[in-house]
C-alpha cells in the first residue's frame, strides 16, 4: 500500500504542474490570472459580451449604457407634454375650420355682374421659331448653354463611375477584414474554452487524486492496526474483544488460527472493496471527458455550418455586385442543394409522422378488438347465468311439488268417501272423453314449470287469506277471451266421440249463487252459457267455486296471449250434435276465492281450455277439493231456486220462464259435474305421468291412482244416468223461441251486478292489505 500511496502522490504533483501550465496559457490569452477573484462590475461586463451573459447581468449592463448616455434612453418621454398634444388638437380644429370657411364665403358673397371682354391673340409655335431664326445672337447663346450642360453631365458621370469602383473595393476589403476578425475571435473563443475545459478536467483529476491519496493513507493505517491485532484471539460475540493467554495450549492455538483466518478474510474483502472504489472514481472523470468530447464535436459542427453560411452570403453579395452569370449558376446549385437537404429532412419527418400514425391506428384497432372480445365474453356469461337461475328455479319447484304431493296424498285418502257421497248429488249428464297422460307429460315445457314454481310460492299467502275470511265474497265476472289461431305447423289432435243431443243447442248454463254477506244485501245471480269443448288434449284443472260465475261477454280489447298459449293445438269442438262455427278456443283462467283483481275483467281457464296455464294451480286447488264439493251441493240447489225466480221475473210468459229455469238448472249442474269429472281425470293423468319419472314414490302414487280410478268410474256412470234426464229437460226448454233473448237479458243484468261486486271486493282487499302493513 505504501507503493500505491507514492504513485498517487506523484500523479497528484504532475496534475498540479499541468494545471499551472493551463493557467499560464489562460493568462496569456485573456491577460489576467484565472485564479484571481474579479470584481462584480468587471465580471458582469465580461459576461454581457457578444454571445455571453444572461439574466440580471445583461439588465445591469443596459442600465449602465443608458446612464452613460451612449445608448438610447430607457423610455422615450414626451418632451412637449400634454399642452403640446392639446395644441395639436387645436391646430387640427383650426385647419378644419379653414377648410370649411371658403364654402361659407361662397354662400355669403354676392354674385358679380357678367362682362364681355375681347380675348388676346395667342402666338403660334411657328411664329416663335421664325422670330428666333431671325436673331443670330440668340442662337449662339443657346449653343453655349447647351455645351455647358453637356459638359457638366459628363463630369458627373465620370465621377460617379470612379466612386462606385472605389466603394466596391473598400467594401470587399472590409468584408474580408470582418471575416478574418470573426475567425480570429472564434479561434480565441475555442482556445479559451478548451483551456478552461482542460483546467476543469485537471481540477477534477486533482480532486480524485487527493481522495485516492486520503483513502490509501487510511487503508495503510487500518492495515497497520489490524496487523497488530491479528496476533490475538478474537471473541465470537460482539463487540469483538482481542485477548491472548500467558500459556498456550492446543485449544488456544486452534482459537488463534481460527481468528487469524477470519481476520485475513476480512483484510482481503477490504482490499477488494478499496480497489473497486478506486476504479469507480477513475470511471467518473472518463465519463465526463466523453461528454465533453461530444459537446466539442457538436460545437465544431455548428461552427463549420456557420462558416459555410457566411461563405454563401459572401458569394451572393459578390454576384450581386459583379453580376457574373457563372457565379449565379453556382449559387443556384448551392441553393438547390440546400433545398434538397431541406426536402430530405421534410421527407424524413413526414415518414416518421406516417409511422407514428400507423402505430396509433394499430393501437386503436387492438383496443377495439379487446373491447369486442370482452363484450362477447360478457354476452357468453349472461346466458350461463340465466341457465343457472333456471336450474335453481327448477330445483326449488321440484322440491315444492314433492312436498305438495305428500300433503295431497294424505288429504285425499281421508276425503275419498265423503267427497264421493257429496259429488254424487251434484253430478249431471256429461259427455265421455279420453285423456292421454303421455301427451301431457310431453307437452309441459320448462317455462311452465318455472311459472308453477312462482305460483307455488304465492299459495301460502292465499291460504292465509282464506282462513282470515269467514264469509264468501260476492260474485266475480269471468270473461273468456278469444284465443288467436295458432300457427299452421301445429296439427289438431283427433276429436273425441261425443254423444249429441238433437234438440238443444250445445250450451251449458252454470248458475252459481253466492252466500249473502248480510241479510239486507241482494243476491246477484249470473248465468253462463258456456260451450265445453271436450278434448283428448291434456287439460288444466279448473274447479268452479261457488262464488265464481262464468259469463261469455264480448271483449272490446283482445289481449295478446303468451307464447305457450299460441303454441297450443287447435281442435274443432263438437258437442251435442252442434259444430262450433269458428275454430277458436276461449282461454278462461281459474279464479281463486281470495285472489285480488286489479283489472275489471278476470280471465278464467275452464276445463275446455288447453294446457296454457301451469299445473301448479290445479295442484293447489286439489287440496281444497273436499271443502268445495261440500258447499257445491247447497250452492247448486240455491242457484236453481234463484234462477227460477230471476227468470220468471224477467220473462213475459210464465210457461216459458218455468221451462227456462229448469233447463238452466239442469245445464248448470251438468256443467259442474263435467268439470269435476274432467278435473279428476286430468289429475289422475298427471299423477300417472309423474309416477313414471319418479321411482322412489311409485308405491304411494299407485295407491292414489287406484283410488282416483274408482272415483272416475263411479262419476262417469252417474253422469250417464243424469245425462238422460238432463236431455229430456233440455228438450222442453228448447221449445220456447224467446228463450235466447231472455238469456241475453239475464246475462247483461248479471254482468252489471258482478262488476259492482268486483269493485266492492277490490276495496275490501285494499283495506286488508293496508291493515297488514
UniProtKB/Swiss-Prot annotation:
**Record PTM N-acetylalanine, positions in chain:** 2
One Gene Ontology cellular component: catalytic step 2 spliceosome
Chain residue numbers at which the record places covalent cross-link Glycyl lysine isopeptide (Lys-Gly) (interchain with G-Cter in SUMO2): 109, 121, 137, 155, 157, 228, 280, 304, 311, 359, 365, 584, 592, 609
Residues modified as Phosphoserine:
48, 58, 66, 96, 100, 114-115, 347, 375, 381, 445, 452, 608, 714, 748, 751
Question: Basic residues composition bias: which ranges?
Answer: 611-631, 690-708
The transmembrane residues are: none
Q: Residues bearing Omega-N-methylarginine?
A: 54
Annotated region (Sufficient for PSAP complex assembly) at 221-284
Q: Which residues carry this modification: Phosphothreonine?
A: 124
| Compositional bias ranges of the Pro residues kind | 481-499
Q: In which compartments does the protein localize?
A: Nucleus speckle; Cell junction, Desmosome
Q: Which family does it belong to?
A: Belongs to the pinin family.
Function field: Transcriptional activator binding to the E-box 1 core sequence of the E-cadherin promoter gene; the core-binding sequence is 5'CAGGTG-3'. Capable of reversing CTBP1-mediated transcription repression. Auxiliary component of the splicing-dependent multiprotein exon junction complex (EJC) deposited at splice junction on mRNAs. The EJC is a dynamic structure consisting of core proteins and several peripheral nuclear and cytoplasmic associated factors that join the complex only transiently either during EJC assembly or during subsequent mRNA metabolism.
Q: What is this protein called?
A: Pinin
Q: Which organism is it from?
A: Canis lupus familiaris (Dog)
Species lineage, top-down?
Eukaryota, Metazoa, Chordata, Craniata, Vertebrata
Gene name, Swiss-Prot/TrEMBL:
PNN
Amino acid at each position: 500500500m505504501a507503493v500505491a500511496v507514492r504513485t498517487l502522490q506523484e500523479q497528484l504533483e504532475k496534475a498540479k504542474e499541468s494545471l499551472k501550465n493551463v493557467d499560464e496559457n489562460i493568462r496569456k490569452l485573456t491577460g489576467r490570472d484565472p485564479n484571481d477573484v474579479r470584481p462584480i462590475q468587471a465580471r458582469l461586463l465580461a459576461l454581457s459580451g457578444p454571445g455571453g451573459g444572461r439574466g440580471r447581468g445583461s439588465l445591469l449592463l443596459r442600465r449602465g449604457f443608458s446612464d452613460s448616455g451612449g445608448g438610447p434612453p430607457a423610455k422615450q418621454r414626451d418632451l412637449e407634454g400634454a399642452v403640446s398634444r392639446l395644441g395639436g388638437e387645436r391646430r387640427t380644429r383650426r385647419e378644419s375650420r379653414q377648410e370649411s370657411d371658403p364654402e361659407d364665403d361662397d354662400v355669403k358673397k354676392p354674385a358679380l355682374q357678367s362682362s364681355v371682354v375681347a380675348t388676346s391673340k395667342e402666338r403660334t409655335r411657328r411664329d416663335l421659331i421664325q422670330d428666333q431664326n431671325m436673331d443670330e445672337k440668340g442662337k449662339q447663346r443657346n449653343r453655349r448653354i447647351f455645351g455647358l450642360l453637356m459638359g457638366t453631365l459628363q463630369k458627373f458621370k465620370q465621377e460617379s463611375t470612379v466612386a462606385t469602383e472605389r466603394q466596391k473595393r473598400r467594401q470587399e476589403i472590409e468584408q474580408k477584414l470582418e471575416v478574418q476578425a470573426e475567425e480570429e475571435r472564434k479561434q480565441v473563443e475555442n482556445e479559451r474554452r478548451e483551456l478552461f475545459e482542460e483546467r476543469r478536467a485537471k481540477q477534477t483529476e486533482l480532486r480524485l487524486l487527493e481522495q485516492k491519496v486520503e483513502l490509501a493513507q487510511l487503508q495503510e493505517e487500518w492495515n497497520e492496526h489490524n496487523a497488530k491485532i491479528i496476533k490475538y484471539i478474537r471473541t465470537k460475540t460482539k463487540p469483538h474483544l482481542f485477548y491472548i493467554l500467558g500459556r498456550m495450549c492446543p485449544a488456544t492455538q486452534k482459537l488463534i488460527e481460527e481468528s487469524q483466518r477470519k481476520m485475513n478474510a476480512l483484510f482481503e474483502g477490504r482490499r477488494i472493496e478499496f480497489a473497486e472504489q478506486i476504479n469507480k472514481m477513475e470511471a467518473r472523470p472518463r465519463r465526463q471527458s466523453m461528454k465533453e468530447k461530444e459537446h466539442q464535436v457538436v460545437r465544431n459542427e455548428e461552427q463549420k455550418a456557420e462558416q459555410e453560411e457566411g461563405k454563401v452570403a459572401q458569394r451572393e453579395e459578390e454576384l450581386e455586385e459583379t453580376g457574373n452569370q457563372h457565379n449565379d449558376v453556382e449559387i443556384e446549385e448551392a441553393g438547390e442543394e440546400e433545398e434538397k437537404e431541406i426536402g430530405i429532412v421534410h421527407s424524413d419527418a413526414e415518414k416518421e409522422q406516417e409511422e407514428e400514425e400507423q402505430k396509433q391506428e394499430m393501437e386503436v384497432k387492438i383496443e377495439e378488438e379487446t373491447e369486442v372480445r370482452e363484450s362477447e365474453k360478457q354476452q357468453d356469461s349472461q346466458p350461463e347465468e340465466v341457465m343457472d337461475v333456471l336450474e335453481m328455479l327448477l330445483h326449488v319447484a321440484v322440491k315444492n311439488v314433492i312436498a305438495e304431493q305428500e300433503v295431497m296424498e294424505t288429504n285425499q285418502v281421508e276425503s275419498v268417501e265423503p267427497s264421493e257421497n257429496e259429488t254424487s248429488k251434484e253430478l249431471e249428464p256429461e259427455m265421455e272423453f279420453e285423456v292421454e297422460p303421455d301427451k301431457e307429460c310431453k307437452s309441459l315445457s320448462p317455462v311452465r314449470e318455472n311459472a308453477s314454481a312462482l305460483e307455488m310460492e304465492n299459495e301460502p299467502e292465499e291460504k292465509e287469506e282464506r282462513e282470515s275470511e269467514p264469509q264468501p265474497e260476492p260474485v266475480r265476472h269471468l270473461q273468456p277471451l278469444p284465443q288467436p289461431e295458432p300457427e299452421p305447423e301445429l296439427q289438431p289432435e283427433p276429436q273425441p266421440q261425443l254423444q249429441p243431443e238433437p234438440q238443444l243447442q250445445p250450451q251449458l248454463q252454470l248458475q252459481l249463487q253466492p252466500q249473502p254477506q248480510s241479510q239486507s244485501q241482494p243476491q246477484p245471480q249470473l248465468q253462463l252459457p258456456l260451450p265445453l269443448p271436450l278434448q283428448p288434449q291434456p287439460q288444466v284443472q279448473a274447479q268452479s267455486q261457488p262464488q265464481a260465475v262464468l259469463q261469455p261477454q264480448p271483449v272490446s280489447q283482445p289481449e295478446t296471449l303468451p307464447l305457450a298459449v299460441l303454441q297450443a293445438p287447435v281442435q274443432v269442438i263438437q258437442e251435442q250434435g252442434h259444430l262450433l262455427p269458428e275454430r277458436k278456443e276461449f282461454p278462461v283462467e281459474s279464479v281463486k276465492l281470495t285472489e285480488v283483481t286489479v283489472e275489471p275483467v278476470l280471465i278464467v281457464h275452464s276445463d275446455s281450455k288447453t294446457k296454457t296455464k301451469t299445473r301448479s294451480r290445479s295442484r293447489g286447488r286439489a287440496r281444497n277439493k273436499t271443502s268445495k264439493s261440500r258447499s257445491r251441493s247447497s250452492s247448486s240447489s240455491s242457484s236453481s231456486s234463484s234462477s227460477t225466480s230471476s227468470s220468471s221475473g224477467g220473462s213475459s210468459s210464465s210457461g216459458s220462464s218455468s221451462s227456462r229455469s229448469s233447463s238452466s238448472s239442469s245445464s248448470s249442474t251438468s256443467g259442474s259435474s263435467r268439470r269435476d269429472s274432467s278435473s279428476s281425470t286430468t289429475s289422475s293423468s298427471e299423477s300417472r305421468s309423474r309416477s313414471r319419472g319418479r321411482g322412489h314414490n311409485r308405491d304411494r302414487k299407485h295407491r292414489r291412482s287406484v283410488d282416483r280410478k274408482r272415483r272416475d268410474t263411479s262419476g262417469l256412470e252417474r253422469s250417464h244416468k243424469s245425462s238422460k234426464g238432463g236431455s229430456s229437460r233440455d228438450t222442453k226448454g228448447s221449445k220456447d223461441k224467446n228463450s235466447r233473448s231472455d238469456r241475453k237479458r239475464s246475462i247483461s243484468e248479471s254482468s252489471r251486478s258482478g262488476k259492482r261486486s268486483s269493485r266492492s271486493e277490490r276495496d275490501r282487499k285494499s283495506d286488508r292489505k293496508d291493515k297488514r302493513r
